Regions:
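As written
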Residues: 94-103
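Acidic, metal-coordinating helix/loop segments flanking the phosphotransfer/catalytic sites
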Residues: 19, 31-50, 58, 91
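Conserved acidic carboxylate
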Residues: 9
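C-terminal output helix
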Residues: 19, 107-120
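Conserved phosphotransfer cores of two-component systems
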Residues: 43-46, 69-77, 95
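Two-component/phosphorelay signaling modules centered on CheY-like receiver
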Residues: 12-30
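Conserved phosphotransfer microenvironments
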Residues: 54-71
Length: 123
């Protein structure tokens, strides 16, 4: 069975398109557009296996905060994928995290599926 993914993206068009793509590939997807929504969805869906998040969200919220909040609920080895166009300081925010994968924006759909197959097969 494929992982249940929490997808966090503040751009509604990107969120909808990515969710549709992942669902078409057979994944179960729960969406959130903010840190607060991500925490709410993580609490409401105990069967989540993985989070995919944009790095920069609305206001001062970041994907790093999303991952930290979900890991507080699910444990420090909860797997995460960050998708972002920011390749500067954001990259270094995750140095040494063996349970995280980083993809640049725009994320190639076939690359995302490859990462999901290889990074999260046993979630």
């Amino acid at each position: 069975m494929k992982p249940h993914i929490l997808l966090v993206e503040d751009n509604a068009t990107v969120l909808g398109a990515t969710a549709l793509f992942l669902e078409g590939a057979g994944y179960r997807v729960t969406t959130a557009a903010s840190l607060a929504e991500a925490i709410e969805r993580a609490r409401a869906n105990p069967d989540l296996n993985l989070v995919i998040t944009d790095y920069h969200l609305r206001g001062a919220d970041t994907g790093k905060q999303v991952i930290a909040a979900v890991r507080e609920l699910r444990g420090p080895t909860f797997r995460a994928i960050v998708i972002s166009g920011d390749t500067s300081s954001a990259v270094h925010a995750f140095d040494g995290d063996n349970y995280l994968c980083w993809l640049g924006k725009p994320a190639n759909s076939s690359l995302l599926l490859t990462v999901l197959r290889n990074f999260a097969p046993a979630c």
